[in-house]
Curated annotation (Swiss-Prot):
F-type ATPases have 2 components, F(1) - the catalytic core - and F(0) - the membrane proton channel. F(1) has five subunits: alpha(3), beta(3), gamma(1), delta(1), epsilon(1). F(0) has four main subunits: a(1), b(1), b'(1) and c(10-14). The alpha and beta chains form an alternating ring which encloses part of the gamma chain. F(1) is attached to F(0) by a central stalk formed by the gamma and epsilon chains, while a peripheral stalk is formed by the delta, b and b' chains. Keywords: ATP synthesis, CF(0), Chloroplast, Hydrogen ion transport, Ion transport, Lipid-binding, Membrane, Plastid, Thylakoid, Transmembrane, Transmembrane helix, Transport. It comes from Zygnema circumcarinatum. The record marks 61 as: Reversibly protonated during proton transport. It is a multi-pass membrane protein. NCBIfam families: ATP_synt_c, PRK07354.1. One of its GO terms (cellular component) is proton-transporting ATP synthase complex. The chain crosses the membrane at residues 4-24, 57-77. F(1)F(0) ATP synthase produces ATP from ADP in the presence of a proton or sodium gradient. F-type ATPases consist of two structural domains, F(1) containing the extramembraneous catalytic core and F(0) containing the membrane proton channel, linked together by a central stalk and a peripheral stalk. During catalysis, ATP synthesis in the catalytic domain of F(1) is coupled via a rotary mechanism of the central stalk subunits to proton translocation. This is ATP synthase subunit c, chloroplastic. Its main location: plastid. Belongs to the ATPase C chain family.
Amino acid sequence: MDSVISAASVIAAGLAVGLASIGPGVGQGTAAGQAVEGIARQPEAEGKIRGTLLLSLAFMEALTIYGLVVALALLFANPFV
């Protein structure tokens, strides 16, 4: 039974990282594209747009890091074993 739990934990860890990176990846691509469009339309607002973009990218990246933390917990501090 322990081998089944270990195998399921490895699969769940892979899914946690994979699924946790899909949303932020799409969001970061969209945000960067919109920022480039905004800077092209209003070059004088470049500093404000860039600052907002970097802050929002950091928040989006935090979601991926949370998925990584869950995956590491499943692999090394498995609560199911």
